[in-house]
């Protein structure tokens, strides 16, 4: 079985070498995340080159995600690198930069004084230190606070203001420079930090459009109350979400985070947009070779919630066991997926879905694939939308996306249950189906004889036109004739031109291939699993006997006795009147 949940790994000092990246890819990494809160362009450029080299060596499709620093508020530097703030003491926050002391610090956002009011809470260093606003002195440019929770405050720590709408820009100048660097480097995703409203996403989209890079997808990171409140408009503008539980858990009470996680995942699922669950998933594996039981449950529950991808941060960027962390996540995901109730999920999502043609096809494909227990769903695609829409219904069968576009292939690295295979561009429907089936076989996920569902859009090459579904047997069609009965049979051919030859050669379960049958052949026919004759006619002896015995018969197959060889393994499909090479899964 192949894992369907995707794994995002943050690349850092512990994982940036080509050899280590190869190990991560072989362990199961699908997307490499680069955190632009740390490091410069030169450092990230080297990492991107190493990721590409490792992907080339392994022959795997691995996407690159650029995670922006975002418009966050931080403290400036402290005296001697750190100060101690004591509970109950007064602390002044200056809007002008000063070197921090236990009496006064400054922040990177001068407009904070306009956004907060008396009684507001200000959190420092991921909420470890909390302050309450006592007074706001706009003339002096200072906020006077009382320390509610003390602790040691170091340089450049994060500042959060729960429940307060801050007027930070959508993207900063640093973000803009980082995104332009990413465009030049050919990245696949931008994870936009601290998204609060749809306009934050559109600001990035405009930048991409101005540089002819609209193919790069935007994943909105939901990290604050405002982002949660505006989730519907954000999802309309973004290509997917990241549930960034770290910063979210600072601004929102810890007990609310699991509920918000479920809400955000469900909203993405309903729209068929990918969602990543992130932060502290296997946090203890930064130091230990095994996860805690709570962490294993956390990963499993995110998958039960419906996440497309699970993410590793410090575990792979700076931890002692980066490869082990990926292997562990792979095993947890694989085992959890075996417990998914695909029929229940499909039924629920069908009720909640929209009434579009693509949605209707997506539902039909998932239902058909489940009812027929097909080996795979094959989706030739130009834009990646078809496999994404099918994945929305969480089919049991793997989804093989066949595309001529390498960038589309990488974008699908984030979508649940989708495996990609590149194939040449085609112009006709017949060519598209042939190329898709060939690519599916090359992927190793299906083999000759397997039953698959193919879904695509016609005319070929048009984006967003998913309107076709075909149930297909991947097999070599050897012969066609008039089928009798709806059954199918698999066995070894027994070629006999006379009754005597048939009686001598026939074995139980063999498939009798002859010119025509008569009463003298009955001892051989009674052992047969199926009959193929050159003689045609629905009232021929073979047709009548086959119906009587309840075995499939195909009549009117030209040159059958020379076409088939003794002992050749074949499948007879009475309903379709076809004979396939080998063991084919026919209905």
Curated annotation (Swiss-Prot):
InterPro entries documented for this protein: PEP-util_enz_mobile_dom, Phosphohistidine_dom_sf, Pyr_Knase, Pyrv/PenolPyrv_kinase-like_dom, Pyrv_kinase-like_dom_sf, Pyrv_Knase-like_insert_dom_sf, Pyrv_Knase_AS, Pyrv_Knase_brl
Effect on the protein upon substituting residue 268 to S: Slight decrease in activity
Required cofactor names: Mg(2+); K(+)
Domain of life: Bacteria
Residues annotated as binding K(+): 35, 37, 67-68
Family matches, as CDD domains: Pyruvate_Kinase
Keyword Nucleotide-binding: yes
Outcome when changing residue 425 to A: Decreases affinity for allosteric activators
Residues the entry annotates as binding Mg(2+): 223, 247
Function summary: Catalyzes the phosphoryl transfer from phosphoenolpyruvate (PEP) to ADP to form pyruvate and ATP. Has a broad specificity for nucleoside diphosphates and can use ADP, GDP, IDP and UDP.
Record NCBIfam families: PRK05826.1, PRK06354.1, pyruv_kin
Name by which UniProt lists this protein: Pyruvate kinase
Organism, as annotated: Geobacillus stearothermophilus (Bacillus stearothermophilus)
